[in-house]
Curated annotation (Swiss-Prot):
Residues 33-44 have a biased composition (Basic and acidic residues). Residues 304-440 are annotated as: Required for interaction with TORC1. It comes from Saccharomyces cerevisiae (strain ATCC 204508 / S288c) (Baker's yeast). InterPro entries: Znf_FYVE, Znf_FYVE-rel, Znf_FYVE_PHD, Znf_RING/FYVE/PHD. Keywords: Membrane, Metal-binding, Phosphoprotein, Transducer, Vacuole, Zinc, Zinc-finger. It is a peripheral membrane protein. It comes from the Eukaryota. This is Glutamine sensor PIB2. The gene is PIB2.
Length: 635
Protein backbone atom coordinates (compact mmCIF):
# COMPACT_ATOMS: atom_id res chain seq x y z
CA UNK A 1 0.00 0.00 0.00
CA UNK A 2 2.87 2.31 0.72
CA UNK A 3 4.34 1.66 -2.73
CA UNK A 4 1.06 2.39 -4.52
CA UNK A 5 0.61 5.56 -2.49
CA UNK A 6 4.02 6.87 -3.37
CA UNK A 7 3.54 6.05 -7.06
CA UNK A 8 0.08 7.62 -7.21
CA UNK A 9 1.31 10.93 -5.56
CA UNK A 10 4.20 11.60 -7.85
CA UNK A 11 2.37 12.39 -11.16
CA UNK A 12 -0.26 14.52 -9.40
CA UNK A 13 2.33 16.77 -7.84
CA UNK A 14 4.15 17.16 -11.09
CA UNK A 15 0.95 18.03 -12.92
CA UNK A 16 0.07 20.69 -10.37
CA UNK A 17 3.44 22.31 -10.66
CA UNK A 18 3.08 22.55 -14.40
CA UNK A 19 -0.40 24.04 -14.10
CA UNK A 20 0.90 26.63 -11.65
CA UNK A 21 3.69 27.69 -13.98
CA UNK A 22 1.24 28.11 -16.86
CA UNK A 23 -1.12 30.22 -14.75
CA UNK A 24 1.75 32.40 -13.59
CA UNK A 25 2.75 32.99 -17.14
CA UNK A 26 -0.79 33.97 -18.27
CA UNK A 27 -1.31 36.20 -15.24
CA UNK A 28 -4.13 34.18 -13.72
CA UNK A 29 -4.24 34.43 -9.98
CA UNK A 30 -3.01 31.51 -8.11
CA UNK A 31 -5.53 29.17 -6.55
CA UNK A 32 -5.89 25.68 -5.23
CA UNK A 33 -6.45 22.76 -7.59
CA UNK A 34 -7.63 20.25 -5.09
CA UNK A 35 -11.00 19.64 -6.79
CA UNK A 36 -9.39 18.72 -10.12
CA UNK A 37 -7.10 16.31 -8.50
CA UNK A 38 -9.89 14.79 -6.49
CA UNK A 39 -12.09 14.44 -9.61
CA UNK A 40 -9.57 12.48 -11.55
CA UNK A 41 -8.38 10.34 -8.70
CA UNK A 42 -11.72 9.73 -7.06
CA UNK A 43 -11.87 6.10 -8.05
CA UNK A 44 -8.50 5.33 -6.60
CA UNK A 45 -9.28 7.04 -3.29
CA UNK A 46 -12.62 5.33 -3.00
CA UNK A 47 -10.86 2.01 -3.50
CA UNK A 48 -8.44 2.72 -0.74
CA UNK A 49 -10.14 4.26 2.28
CA UNK A 50 -7.03 4.29 4.44
CA UNK A 51 -5.17 6.67 2.10
CA UNK A 52 -5.29 10.34 3.36
CA UNK A 53 -5.64 13.42 1.14
CA UNK A 54 -2.38 14.69 -0.33
CA UNK A 55 -0.67 17.92 1.01
CA UNK A 56 -0.59 20.74 -1.53
CA UNK A 57 1.95 23.65 -1.64
CA UNK A 58 1.46 26.99 -3.39
CA UNK A 59 4.17 29.35 -4.53
CA UNK A 60 3.82 33.01 -3.60
CA UNK A 61 5.62 35.72 -5.46
CA UNK A 62 7.16 38.19 -2.97
CA UNK A 63 7.23 41.83 -4.04
CA UNK A 64 10.53 43.73 -3.64
CA UNK A 65 10.91 45.83 -0.45
CA UNK A 66 10.23 49.48 -0.92
CA UNK A 67 12.54 52.25 0.32
CA UNK A 68 12.12 53.59 3.88
CA UNK A 69 11.78 57.22 2.74
CA UNK A 70 9.28 58.81 0.43
CA UNK A 71 10.32 60.53 -2.77
CA UNK A 72 9.28 63.90 -1.41
CA UNK A 73 11.50 63.59 1.67
CA UNK A 74 14.47 62.47 -0.44
CA UNK A 75 14.15 65.39 -2.83
CA UNK A 76 13.77 67.94 -0.07
CA UNK A 77 16.80 66.61 1.85
CA UNK A 78 18.94 66.62 -1.31
CA UNK A 79 18.04 70.19 -2.14
CA UNK A 80 18.55 71.45 1.40
CA UNK A 81 21.91 69.75 1.91
CA UNK A 82 23.26 70.90 -1.41
CA UNK A 83 22.42 74.50 -0.55
CA UNK A 84 23.99 74.19 2.91
CA UNK A 85 27.17 72.66 1.50
CA UNK A 86 27.52 75.42 -1.08
CA UNK A 87 27.01 78.10 1.53
CA UNK A 88 29.60 76.52 3.85
CA UNK A 89 32.14 76.24 1.10
CA UNK A 90 31.73 79.94 0.35
CA UNK A 91 32.16 80.84 3.99
CA UNK A 92 35.29 78.66 4.31
CA UNK A 93 36.81 80.42 1.31
CA UNK A 94 36.06 83.83 2.82
CA UNK A 95 37.53 82.89 6.20
CA UNK A 96 40.66 81.44 4.62
CA UNK A 97 41.11 84.66 2.63
CA UNK A 98 40.66 86.88 5.71
CA UNK A 99 42.90 84.60 7.86
CA UNK A 100 40.33 83.63 10.47
CA UNK A 101 41.14 79.91 10.39
CA UNK A 102 38.80 79.00 13.21
CA UNK A 103 36.06 77.39 11.07
CA UNK A 104 32.35 78.01 11.59
CA UNK A 105 32.69 80.00 14.81
CA UNK A 106 34.60 83.05 16.01
CA UNK A 107 37.44 82.69 18.49
CA UNK A 108 35.58 84.38 21.31
CA UNK A 109 32.61 82.12 20.70
CA UNK A 110 34.96 79.14 20.86
CA UNK A 111 36.20 80.33 24.23
CA UNK A 112 32.70 81.01 25.51
CA UNK A 113 31.10 77.77 24.26
CA UNK A 114 33.60 75.05 23.28
CA UNK A 115 30.79 72.50 23.28
CA UNK A 116 29.04 74.47 20.51
CA UNK A 117 32.13 74.35 18.30
CA UNK A 118 32.54 70.61 18.68
CA UNK A 119 28.85 70.05 17.90
CA UNK A 120 28.98 72.15 14.75
CA UNK A 121 32.11 70.44 13.46
CA UNK A 122 30.65 67.00 14.13
CA UNK A 123 27.37 67.89 12.44
CA UNK A 124 29.14 69.27 9.37
CA UNK A 125 31.13 66.06 8.91
CA UNK A 126 28.06 63.90 9.37
CA UNK A 127 25.98 65.99 6.99
CA UNK A 128 28.64 65.83 4.28
CA UNK A 129 28.72 62.04 4.47
CA UNK A 130 24.95 61.80 4.52
CA UNK A 131 24.49 64.18 1.63
CA UNK A 132 26.91 62.27 -0.58
CA UNK A 133 25.31 58.96 0.33
CA UNK A 134 21.76 60.22 -0.09
CA UNK A 135 22.56 61.82 -3.44
CA UNK A 136 23.88 58.55 -4.80
CA UNK A 137 20.97 56.59 -3.39
CA UNK A 138 18.45 59.11 -4.66
CA UNK A 139 19.81 59.04 -8.20
CA UNK A 140 19.65 55.21 -8.24
CA UNK A 141 16.09 55.21 -7.01
CA UNK A 142 15.00 57.83 -9.51
CA UNK A 143 16.51 55.84 -12.40
CA UNK A 144 14.86 52.62 -11.16
CA UNK A 145 11.46 54.23 -10.84
CA UNK A 146 11.28 55.99 -14.16
CA UNK A 147 9.19 53.04 -15.52
CA UNK A 148 6.53 53.61 -12.85
CA UNK A 149 6.15 57.34 -13.45
CA UNK A 150 2.45 57.20 -12.73
CA UNK A 151 3.14 58.00 -9.03
CA UNK A 152 3.32 61.65 -8.04
CA UNK A 153 5.07 63.48 -5.25
CA UNK A 154 3.15 63.47 -1.98
CA UNK A 155 0.82 60.55 -2.72
CA UNK A 156 2.73 57.87 -0.84
CA UNK A 157 3.40 57.88 2.87
CA UNK A 158 6.87 57.15 4.21
CA UNK A 159 7.33 53.86 6.03
CA UNK A 160 4.00 52.53 4.50
CA UNK A 161 5.27 51.01 1.21
CA UNK A 162 6.43 47.87 2.94
CA UNK A 163 3.65 45.41 2.41
CA UNK A 164 5.05 43.01 4.96
CA UNK A 165 4.77 45.51 7.80
CA UNK A 166 0.98 45.74 7.43
CA UNK A 167 -0.39 42.42 6.13
CA UNK A 168 -3.94 43.79 5.88
CA UNK A 169 -2.91 46.33 3.17
CA UNK A 170 -1.28 43.70 0.85
CA UNK A 171 -3.72 42.69 -1.96
CA UNK A 172 -1.70 39.61 -2.85
CA UNK A 173 -1.66 38.27 0.64
CA UNK A 174 -3.66 35.09 1.09
CA UNK A 175 -4.24 32.73 3.91
CA UNK A 176 -3.68 29.06 3.23
CA UNK A 177 -5.58 26.58 5.27
CA UNK A 178 -4.32 23.01 5.37
CA UNK A 179 -7.06 20.46 5.76
CA UNK A 180 -6.69 16.75 6.23
CA UNK A 181 -10.38 16.02 6.03
CA UNK A 182 -12.18 15.14 2.82
CA UNK A 183 -14.43 18.27 2.58
CA UNK A 184 -11.82 20.99 3.59
CA UNK A 185 -11.10 23.71 1.03
CA UNK A 186 -8.67 26.64 1.11
CA UNK A 187 -10.02 30.20 0.87
CA UNK A 188 -8.19 33.41 -0.01
CA UNK A 189 -8.90 36.76 1.65
CA UNK A 190 -8.45 39.98 -0.38
CA UNK A 191 -8.47 43.40 1.39
CA UNK A 192 -8.23 46.75 -0.36
CA UNK A 193 -7.47 50.25 0.87
CA UNK A 194 -10.36 52.59 1.56
CA UNK A 195 -10.80 55.77 -0.42
CA UNK A 196 -11.08 58.04 2.65
CA UNK A 197 -7.65 57.03 3.98
CA UNK A 198 -6.10 57.76 0.59
CA UNK A 199 -7.54 61.27 0.52
CA UNK A 200 -6.20 62.13 4.02
CA UNK A 201 -2.72 60.90 3.14
CA UNK A 202 -2.63 63.03 -0.01
CA UNK A 203 -3.55 66.18 1.94
CA UNK A 204 -0.81 65.57 4.52
CA UNK A 205 1.84 65.01 1.88
CA UNK A 206 0.91 68.21 0.07
CA UNK A 207 1.26 70.19 3.31
CA UNK A 208 4.71 68.72 3.90
CA UNK A 209 5.91 69.71 0.44
CA UNK A 210 4.69 73.28 0.78
CA UNK A 211 6.46 73.68 4.14
CA UNK A 212 9.70 72.31 2.69
CA UNK A 213 9.56 74.76 -0.21
CA UNK A 214 8.96 77.69 2.13
CA UNK A 215 11.98 76.74 4.24
CA UNK A 216 14.14 76.54 1.15
CA UNK A 217 13.10 79.98 -0.05
CA UNK A 218 13.60 81.62 3.37
CA UNK A 219 17.02 80.00 3.79
CA UNK A 220 18.15 81.28 0.36
CA UNK A 221 17.00 84.81 1.17
CA UNK A 222 18.74 84.85 4.56
CA UNK A 223 21.95 83.47 3.11
CA UNK A 224 22.06 86.12 0.38
CA UNK A 225 21.30 88.95 2.83
CA UNK A 226 23.97 87.75 5.27
CA UNK A 227 26.58 87.58 2.52
CA UNK A 228 25.73 91.07 1.32
CA UNK A 229 25.85 92.55 4.84
CA UNK A 230 29.13 90.83 5.67
CA UNK A 231 30.73 92.32 2.52
CA UNK A 232 29.48 95.78 3.45
CA UNK A 233 30.82 95.47 6.99
CA UNK A 234 34.24 94.34 5.77
CA UNK A 235 34.44 97.28 3.42
CA UNK A 236 33.47 99.72 6.16
CA UNK A 237 35.94 98.22 8.64
CA UNK A 238 38.79 98.53 6.15
CA UNK A 239 37.90 102.15 5.49
CA UNK A 240 37.62 102.92 9.23
CA UNK A 241 41.03 101.35 9.96
CA UNK A 242 42.70 103.52 7.29
CA UNK A 243 41.33 106.74 8.82
CA UNK A 244 42.72 107.85 12.22
CA UNK A 245 39.58 109.54 13.62
CA UNK A 246 35.95 108.52 13.24
CA UNK A 247 33.10 110.99 13.68
CA UNK A 248 30.06 110.38 15.84
CA UNK A 249 27.82 110.06 12.79
CA UNK A 250 29.90 107.21 11.41
CA UNK A 251 29.78 105.38 14.75
CA UNK A 252 26.01 105.66 14.81
CA UNK A 253 25.82 104.16 11.32
CA UNK A 254 28.02 101.25 12.35
CA UNK A 255 25.82 100.62 15.36
CA UNK A 256 22.75 100.58 13.11
CA UNK A 257 24.40 98.04 10.83
CA UNK A 258 25.31 95.88 13.81
CA UNK A 259 21.71 95.98 14.97
CA UNK A 260 20.59 94.84 11.52
CA UNK A 261 23.08 92.00 11.64
CA UNK A 262 21.80 90.85 15.01
CA UNK A 263 18.22 90.93 13.78
CA UNK A 264 19.06 88.96 10.62
CA UNK A 265 21.10 86.46 12.59
CA UNK A 266 18.30 86.04 15.09
CA UNK A 267 15.83 85.48 12.24
CA UNK A 268 18.08 82.96 10.55
CA UNK A 269 18.06 80.47 13.37
CA UNK A 270 18.09 76.80 12.61
CA UNK A 271 17.37 73.76 14.70
CA UNK A 272 19.45 70.64 14.97
CA UNK A 273 17.99 67.45 16.34
CA UNK A 274 20.22 65.37 18.66
CA UNK A 275 18.33 62.32 19.84
CA UNK A 276 14.99 63.46 21.25
CA UNK A 277 15.96 67.13 21.93
CA UNK A 278 16.00 70.14 19.63
CA UNK A 279 19.04 72.39 20.05
CA UNK A 280 18.79 75.95 18.72
CA UNK A 281 22.04 77.25 17.23
CA UNK A 282 23.01 80.45 15.50
CA UNK A 283 23.34 80.66 11.76
CA UNK A 284 26.65 79.77 10.21
CA UNK A 285 27.36 83.34 9.07
CA UNK A 286 28.93 85.41 11.84
CA UNK A 287 29.33 89.00 10.81
CA UNK A 288 32.10 91.10 12.28
CA UNK A 289 31.04 92.81 15.51
CA UNK A 290 32.66 95.41 17.74
CA UNK A 291 34.75 93.95 20.56
CA UNK A 292 32.47 95.26 23.31
CA UNK A 293 29.47 93.54 21.74
CA UNK A 294 31.42 90.34 21.18
CA UNK A 295 32.20 90.21 24.87
CA UNK A 296 28.53 90.61 25.68
CA UNK A 297 27.46 87.86 23.29
CA UNK A 298 26.50 84.58 24.95
CA UNK A 299 25.98 81.10 23.50
CA UNK A 300 22.34 80.32 22.75
CA UNK A 301 22.40 76.67 23.69
CA UNK A 302 19.45 75.69 25.76
CA UNK A 303 21.19 72.83 27.53
CA UNK A 304 24.15 74.95 28.72
CA UNK A 305 23.62 76.16 32.34
CA UNK A 306 23.56 79.92 32.76
CA UNK A 307 25.87 81.28 35.48
CA UNK A 308 24.18 82.85 38.46
CA UNK A 309 24.45 86.56 39.11
CA UNK A 310 27.45 87.85 41.05
CA UNK A 311 25.26 89.70 43.53
CA UNK A 312 23.51 86.52 44.56
CA UNK A 313 26.84 84.76 44.94
CA UNK A 314 28.23 87.55 47.09
CA UNK A 315 25.11 87.66 49.23
CA UNK A 316 25.19 83.92 49.81
CA UNK A 317 28.89 83.96 50.60
CA UNK A 318 28.49 86.80 53.09
CA UNK A 319 25.57 85.05 54.70
CA UNK A 320 27.60 81.86 54.95
CA UNK A 321 30.53 83.68 56.54
CA UNK A 322 28.34 85.37 59.11
CA UNK A 323 26.98 82.03 60.30
CA UNK A 324 30.38 80.34 60.53
CA UNK A 325 32.20 80.75 63.83
CA UNK A 326 35.81 81.85 63.69
CA UNK A 327 38.37 79.30 64.84
CA UNK A 328 40.99 81.83 65.92
CA UNK A 329 38.87 83.48 68.62
CA UNK A 330 40.97 83.97 71.77
CA UNK A 331 39.91 81.73 74.61
CA UNK A 332 40.36 82.52 78.28
CA UNK A 333 40.87 79.70 80.75
CA UNK A 334 38.29 79.15 83.43
CA UNK A 335 40.85 79.52 86.22
CA UNK A 336 44.17 81.42 86.30
CA UNK A 337 46.66 80.53 89.05
CA UNK A 338 47.72 83.31 91.38
CA UNK A 339 51.27 83.24 90.06
CA UNK A 340 50.13 83.93 86.47
CA UNK A 341 47.66 86.69 87.32
CA UNK A 342 48.48 90.26 86.43
CA UNK A 343 49.07 92.71 89.26
CA UNK A 344 47.32 95.43 87.26
CA UNK A 345 44.02 93.61 87.61
CA UNK A 346 43.95 94.24 91.35
CA UNK A 347 44.89 97.96 91.01
CA UNK A 348 46.92 97.77 94.23
CA UNK A 349 50.30 99.43 94.56
CA UNK A 350 53.12 98.76 97.01
CA UNK A 351 52.39 101.95 98.92
CA UNK A 352 48.81 100.88 99.51
CA UNK A 353 49.96 97.54 100.89
CA UNK A 354 52.55 99.18 103.13
CA UNK A 355 50.12 101.71 104.58
CA UNK A 356 47.49 99.02 105.16
CA UNK A 357 50.01 96.80 106.93
CA UNK A 358 51.30 99.52 109.23
CA UNK A 359 47.90 100.89 110.11
CA UNK A 360 46.54 97.43 110.89
CA UNK A 361 49.59 96.66 113.03
CA UNK A 362 49.12 99.67 115.26
CA UNK A 363 45.37 99.16 115.41
CA UNK A 364 46.04 95.65 116.63
CA UNK A 365 48.43 96.90 119.30
CA UNK A 366 46.01 99.54 120.54
CA UNK A 367 43.19 97.02 120.69
CA UNK A 368 45.37 94.70 122.73
CA UNK A 369 46.10 97.48 125.19
CA UNK A 370 42.44 98.28 125.62
CA UNK A 371 41.66 94.58 125.86
CA UNK A 372 43.10 94.37 129.42
CA UNK A 373 40.24 96.44 130.73
CA UNK A 374 37.90 93.98 132.52
CA UNK A 375 34.90 96.14 131.69
CA UNK A 376 35.33 95.41 127.93
CA UNK A 377 33.20 92.69 126.38
CA UNK A 378 34.36 89.65 124.46
CA UNK A 379 33.94 91.47 121.14
CA UNK A 380 37.33 93.09 121.66
CA UNK A 381 39.10 89.71 121.75
CA UNK A 382 37.35 88.60 118.57
CA UNK A 383 38.37 91.83 116.88
CA UNK A 384 41.96 91.36 117.97
CA UNK A 385 42.06 87.88 116.43
CA UNK A 386 40.70 89.24 113.18
CA UNK A 387 43.30 92.00 113.18
CA UNK A 388 46.08 89.46 113.64
CA UNK A 389 44.81 87.50 110.64
CA UNK A 390 44.67 90.64 108.52
CA UNK A 391 48.24 91.49 109.48
CA UNK A 392 49.58 88.09 108.45
CA UNK A 393 47.71 88.07 105.13
CA UNK A 394 48.79 91.59 104.21
CA UNK A 395 52.38 90.80 105.09
CA UNK A 396 52.35 87.83 102.73
CA UNK A 397 50.91 89.97 99.92
CA UNK A 398 53.66 92.49 100.50
CA UNK A 399 56.30 89.80 100.11
CA UNK A 400 54.78 88.64 96.81
CA UNK A 401 55.16 92.12 95.32
CA UNK A 402 58.91 91.96 95.94
CA UNK A 403 59.02 95.19 97.89
CA UNK A 404 61.48 93.66 100.34
CA UNK A 405 63.98 92.91 97.60
CA UNK A 406 63.75 96.46 96.31
CA UNK A 407 64.29 97.91 99.76
CA UNK A 408 67.34 95.72 100.35
CA UNK A 409 68.81 96.73 97.00
CA UNK A 410 68.45 100.38 97.88
CA UNK A 411 69.98 99.86 101.29
CA UNK A 412 72.95 97.94 99.93
CA UNK A 413 73.60 100.59 97.32
CA UNK A 414 73.35 103.31 99.97
CA UNK A 415 75.85 101.50 102.23
CA UNK A 416 78.36 100.71 99.51
CA UNK A 417 78.07 104.04 97.69
CA UNK A 418 76.83 106.56 100.25
CA UNK A 419 77.85 109.59 98.18
CA UNK A 420 76.22 108.39 94.97
CA UNK A 421 72.63 108.87 96.14
CA UNK A 422 71.52 112.41 96.98
CA UNK A 423 69.95 113.12 100.33
CA UNK A 424 66.63 113.95 98.73
CA UNK A 425 66.48 110.57 96.98
CA UNK A 426 67.74 108.80 100.08
CA UNK A 427 64.89 110.26 102.07
CA UNK A 428 62.40 108.92 99.56
CA UNK A 429 63.82 105.41 99.88
CA UNK A 430 63.00 105.24 103.59
CA UNK A 431 59.40 104.23 104.32
CA UNK A 432 57.56 106.79 106.42
CA UNK A 433 54.09 107.21 107.85
CA UNK A 434 52.38 110.55 108.25
CA UNK A 435 49.05 112.21 108.46
CA UNK A 436 47.10 112.86 105.30
CA UNK A 437 47.11 116.60 105.96
CA UNK A 438 50.79 116.86 106.96
CA UNK A 439 53.86 117.07 104.75
CA UNK A 440 56.40 114.28 104.29
CA UNK A 441 58.27 113.48 107.53
CA UNK A 442 62.03 113.87 107.62
CA UNK A 443 64.07 110.77 108.52
CA UNK A 444 65.63 110.45 111.99
CA UNK A 445 68.71 112.53 112.63
CA UNK A 446 72.22 111.02 112.54
CA UNK A 447 73.93 113.50 114.78
CA UNK A 448 74.07 111.10 117.69
CA UNK A 449 75.60 108.25 115.68
CA UNK A 450 78.95 106.88 116.80
CA UNK A 451 81.68 107.17 114.13
CA UNK A 452 82.64 103.96 112.34
CA UNK A 453 86.25 104.20 113.51
CA UNK A 454 85.25 103.98 117.19
CA UNK A 455 84.20 100.31 117.02
CA UNK A 456 85.74 97.27 115.34
CA UNK A 457 83.31 94.71 116.84
CA UNK A 458 79.65 94.40 117.76
CA UNK A 459 78.73 96.19 120.97
CA UNK A 460 76.44 93.37 122.09
CA UNK A 461 78.29 90.13 121.11
CA UNK A 462 81.78 91.54 120.31
CA UNK A 463 81.86 89.85 116.89
CA UNK A 464 84.63 91.44 114.82
CA UNK A 465 83.61 93.19 111.62
CA UNK A 466 85.04 91.77 108.40
CA UNK A 467 84.32 91.94 104.73
CA UNK A 468 81.30 89.69 105.22
CA UNK A 469 80.16 90.97 108.60
CA UNK A 470 79.36 94.63 108.15
CA UNK A 471 78.69 97.45 110.60
CA UNK A 472 75.12 98.56 111.33
CA UNK A 473 74.03 101.66 113.28
CA UNK A 474 71.02 101.62 115.52
CA UNK A 475 68.80 104.54 114.54
CA UNK A 476 67.65 105.15 118.10
CA UNK A 477 70.82 104.92 120.22
CA UNK A 478 73.35 105.45 117.41
CA UNK A 479 75.66 102.60 118.43
CA UNK A 480 77.18 100.00 116.04
CA UNK A 481 75.97 96.38 116.02
CA UNK A 482 76.18 93.28 113.86
CA UNK A 483 73.32 92.16 111.64
CA UNK A 484 72.09 89.56 114.13
CA UNK A 485 71.50 92.14 116.87
CA UNK A 486 69.93 94.79 114.68
CA UNK A 487 66.83 93.13 113.31
CA UNK A 488 63.91 94.99 114.92
CA UNK A 489 61.88 97.76 113.36
CA UNK A 490 60.04 100.60 115.10
CA UNK A 491 58.77 104.05 114.21
CA UNK A 492 60.96 107.03 115.09
CA UNK A 493 60.42 110.73 114.62
CA UNK A 494 62.90 113.19 113.16
CA UNK A 495 64.75 113.40 116.53
CA UNK A 496 65.18 109.57 116.69
CA UNK A 497 62.62 109.25 119.49
CA UNK A 498 60.08 106.44 119.83
CA UNK A 499 56.55 107.06 118.62
CA UNK A 500 54.07 105.37 120.89
CA UNK A 501 50.91 103.74 119.71
CA UNK A 502 48.54 106.38 121.03
CA UNK A 503 50.61 109.14 119.51
CA UNK A 504 50.77 107.31 116.19
CA UNK A 505 47.00 107.01 116.07
CA UNK A 506 46.68 110.73 116.86
CA UNK A 507 49.27 111.69 114.26
CA UNK A 508 52.40 111.52 116.40
CA UNK A 509 54.14 114.23 118.40
CA UNK A 510 55.85 115.74 115.40
CA UNK A 511 53.15 114.85 112.91
CA UNK A 512 54.41 111.39 111.86
CA UNK A 513 57.30 108.92 111.94
CA UNK A 514 59.72 106.72 109.98
CA UNK A 515 60.16 102.97 110.25
CA UNK A 516 63.77 102.33 111.33
CA UNK A 517 66.04 99.55 112.55
CA UNK A 518 66.76 99.32 116.27
CA UNK A 519 68.94 97.08 118.43
CA UNK A 520 67.89 94.64 121.12
CA UNK A 521 68.53 97.09 123.98
CA UNK A 522 66.36 99.74 122.41
CA UNK A 523 63.62 97.17 121.94
CA UNK A 524 63.70 96.37 125.68
CA UNK A 525 63.52 100.06 126.42
CA UNK A 526 60.52 100.43 124.13
CA UNK A 527 58.77 97.52 125.83
CA UNK A 528 59.31 99.03 129.26
CA UNK A 529 57.95 102.33 128.06
CA UNK A 530 54.91 100.70 126.47
CA UNK A 531 54.09 98.73 129.62
CA UNK A 532 54.40 101.87 131.73
CA UNK A 533 52.13 103.73 129.35
CA UNK A 534 49.66 100.85 129.39
CA UNK A 535 49.50 100.80 133.19
CA UNK A 536 48.99 104.51 133.26
CA UNK A 537 46.19 104.26 130.72
CA UNK A 538 44.39 101.49 132.61
CA UNK A 539 44.56 103.44 135.86
CA UNK A 540 43.42 106.59 134.17
CA UNK A 541 40.40 104.80 132.73
CA UNK A 542 39.24 103.98 136.24
CA UNK A 543 39.84 107.52 137.47
CA UNK A 544 38.40 109.31 134.44
CA UNK A 545 34.90 108.46 135.61
CA UNK A 546 35.39 111.00 138.43
CA UNK A 547 38.15 113.33 137.28
CA UNK A 548 37.50 113.59 133.54
CA UNK A 549 40.12 114.15 130.88
CA UNK A 550 42.73 116.01 132.94
CA UNK A 551 44.84 112.91 133.44
CA UNK A 552 45.31 112.45 129.66
CA UNK A 553 47.04 115.78 129.46
CA UNK A 554 49.25 114.84 132.41
CA UNK A 555 50.30 111.60 130.73
CA UNK A 556 51.29 113.47 127.60
CA UNK A 557 53.35 115.90 129.63
CA UNK A 558 55.09 113.02 131.36
CA UNK A 559 55.95 111.39 128.03
CA UNK A 560 57.41 114.63 126.76
CA UNK A 561 59.51 115.02 129.86
CA UNK A 562 60.73 111.47 129.42
CA UNK A 563 61.95 112.16 125.89
CA UNK A 564 63.68 115.37 126.97
CA UNK A 565 65.49 113.60 129.78
CA UNK A 566 66.51 110.78 127.45
CA UNK A 567 68.01 113.17 124.92
CA UNK A 568 69.96 114.95 127.62
CA UNK A 569 71.37 111.73 129.08
CA UNK A 570 71.99 109.82 125.79
CA UNK A 571 75.75 110.27 126.12
CA UNK A 572 75.85 108.85 129.65
CA UNK A 573 74.09 105.56 128.89
CA UNK A 574 75.94 102.43 130.19
CA UNK A 575 77.48 100.16 127.58
CA UNK A 576 77.74 96.40 127.78
CA UNK A 577 81.21 95.00 128.21
CA UNK A 578 82.40 97.93 130.38
CA UNK A 579 83.74 97.75 133.98
CA UNK A 580 81.60 97.74 137.08
CA UNK A 581 82.88 101.16 138.06
CA UNK A 582 81.67 102.64 134.83
CA UNK A 583 78.25 101.10 135.43
CA UNK A 584 78.15 102.54 138.88
CA UNK A 585 79.05 106.02 137.77
CA UNK A 586 76.60 105.86 134.93
CA UNK A 587 73.81 104.60 137.19
CA UNK A 588 74.33 107.53 139.50
CA UNK A 589 74.12 110.08 136.76
CA UNK A 590 71.47 108.57 134.49
CA UNK A 591 67.86 109.34 135.04
CA UNK A 592 65.03 106.90 134.68
CA UNK A 593 61.67 107.69 133.18
CA UNK A 594 59.23 109.16 135.60
CA UNK A 595 56.51 106.79 136.64
CA UNK A 596 53.64 108.29 138.49
CA UNK A 597 51.67 105.85 140.54
CA UNK A 598 48.86 106.51 142.89
CA UNK A 599 48.51 104.94 146.30
CA UNK A 600 45.78 102.62 145.09
CA UNK A 601 47.99 101.45 142.28
CA UNK A 602 50.89 100.71 144.64
CA UNK A 603 48.58 98.71 146.88
CA UNK A 604 47.35 96.69 143.95
CA UNK A 605 50.91 95.97 142.92
CA UNK A 606 51.80 94.76 146.39
CA UNK A 607 48.80 92.45 146.52
CA UNK A 608 49.21 90.93 143.11
CA UNK A 609 52.98 90.66 143.40
CA UNK A 610 54.91 90.10 140.19
CA UNK A 611 52.12 88.46 138.26
CA UNK A 612 50.99 91.67 136.65
CA UNK A 613 54.54 92.64 135.75
CA UNK A 614 55.11 89.30 134.11
CA UNK A 615 51.94 89.68 132.12
CA UNK A 616 52.97 93.14 131.02
CA UNK A 617 56.38 91.89 129.99
CA UNK A 618 54.78 89.21 127.89
CA UNK A 619 52.53 91.79 126.27
CA UNK A 620 55.42 94.10 125.53
CA UNK A 621 57.53 91.34 124.07
CA UNK A 622 54.72 90.28 121.76
CA UNK A 623 54.27 93.82 120.49
CA UNK A 624 57.89 94.73 119.94
CA UNK A 625 59.56 91.45 119.05
CA UNK A 626 57.77 90.95 115.71
CA UNK A 627 58.70 93.51 113.05
CA UNK A 628 56.00 95.17 111.02
CA UNK A 629 57.08 93.70 107.67
CA UNK A 630 57.73 90.17 108.94
CA UNK A 631 56.32 87.23 106.95
CA UNK A 632 56.94 83.53 106.49
CA UNK A 633 59.35 84.04 103.60
CA UNK A 634 61.84 86.07 105.68
CA UNK A 635 63.58 83.08 107.25
Amino acid sequence: MTALHSVSKTPAIKEEEEDGDERDGRGVPLGPRNHDYRGRKGDEESGADTVTSPITFEKKKIAPRASTHSEQSILSSISLKSMVNQHRQQQLQQESSTGAGTGFVDRKQQIQSPAMVSILRKNSAEENVRSSHSSKLGEGQIDGRKASASKEIGKTLPFTDDQRSNPELDPTNSVVDVSRGKNTKSKTVFNELEDDADDDDEVRQKNLTTQALRKLSSFKMNASSNLRLSKENKAKESSSSSTSSVSSSSTSKVENIVDKLTTTNSSSMSQLRFGNTNVIIDSVNHAAKPPHQQMLRKPSLEFLPQPASSTNLNFNSNKHKSNVRQISNPKKPLYIPAVLRKVSETNITNDDLLNATLSSYYKKASNLEHGFNPSKSQSASVQNANNLRIISSQSSVQSNTSSILESYKNKISSYLFPNSIPNSDRINLIPTISNRNSARVNPPTKDHWIPDSKRNSCRYCHKPFTLWERKHHCRHCGDIFCQDHLRHWLYLDSQANFIMINELNNGGINGGGTLCKICDDCLVEYENLSTTNHNANTNEDNINVEEGEDDDNDNRKKLRNYYKNRQMNALFRPKKGGSSQEHATVDRDTTTPIQVKSNDEEADNENTGGEQEEGNDVLGSVIGSVPANWNWSSF
